[in-house]
Amino acid sequence: MKNNTPHAPLILASASPRRLDLLARIGIIPTHTLPADIDESETPKELPRDVALRLAQEKAQKIYENNKDKNAFILAADTVVACGRRTLPKGETQEDACYCLKLISGRSHRIYGGLCIITPNGTVIKKCIETRVKFKHLSKQEIDQYVASGEWKGKAGAYGIQGRAEAFVKSIHGSHSNIVGLSLYDTMNILNGLDFFKPV
């Protein structure tokens, strides 16, 4: 059986251990991880899906412009969690976590995964992947226990589906890995279309 190996280096424009782990599942080990220092503020009336796509592209573009390895592909992603048209914050404080969990308790919400890949010749490919998630109704005790766990820290929407919060999920429509931080299906499809892999 033939394996696929990347024919060119790939720079992940992120320091996220979750995205590194996801890429490793499909046999991709980035040659470098370079978090992009960009302004992640929303613009007025910007829709959540547009935020995810814009931030992913800005991250990729920032690394591409400063990258000295002209044979490298750049991959960037951004995750935005939204309930209705309301964008949920990343979990920075316990107040953030309580706010998010109370808002999505018993409700459906959407995860928008912005994905941007820039090829060595500067071609930009971008896509926004949407996953719908429905949580069960959360009791005060469940919210308090989850907040005390600290799992929500730094995560979009203040929860991580790969941890204790998976027990809150009634249903998922779409890519599970998109919720974690990167749609593997879409990433692989785009890279295959760019001849990123070659058989060995």
Predicted segments — roles?
Residues V51, T79-H109, F135-H137:
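Active-site-adjacent loop/tail segments of enzyme domains
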Residues A82, C116-P120, K136, K170-S171:
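Short beta-strand-to-turn element immediately C-terminal to the catalytic PLP-Schiff-base lysine
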Residues M1-F73, R86-T87, A148-S149, N192-V200:
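N-terminal polybasic phosphate/anion-binding patch
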Residues K126-V200:
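Active-site oxyanion/phosphate-handling segment shared across diverse enzymes
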Residues T79-A82, I111-I118, Y159:
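Short beta-strand scaffold segments in enzyme catalytic cores
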Residues F73-T79:
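Ordered, amphipathic secondary-structure segments that act as subunit-interaction surfaces
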Residues L23, A56, D78, A97, ...:
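Residue-level signal for inorganic ion chemistry
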Residues C98-L103, G113-L115, G122-K126, E130-T131:
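Anionic-ligand binding region
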